[in-house]
């Protein structure tokens, strides 16, 4: 894309802004002319996936779901992961002590599948962003007290295609990446 990033963030330097009633620390994800964003409200009791038009900033759709509030670190949010995208779907993950919820929506906002991968234990809250690799959604879920796993879900169905148990006793915050041998 042909654009220049401004050195100052002033109103004259951006085309539109989008006031949000909810919050989150994840980054927006862009596919074509659509911007997707995860957000949360009411101390995590509501989780939201939002789609806006990248040209105008107008909200195209919002999908909100009930969730459970829980303790998290004061510098974390209840929506700290970035959505993953492919040409057909937007994928989001949300974690708290009793569940790790992965979901897929089509680009028009219709829910395709949801999958609960168990809880997340850790004093700082959940913050992992999934990635799409080929036809798999990759989600790490290391646990502070051990017993976590890394998952590969089928992008189309949400079925677990593989799971790697992890002995780690540290919570994961990094986004996975795919290594290609030279």
Please place each PLM-identified region on the residue numbering.
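Noncatalytic, solvent-exposed loop/strand surfaces
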Residues: 1-182
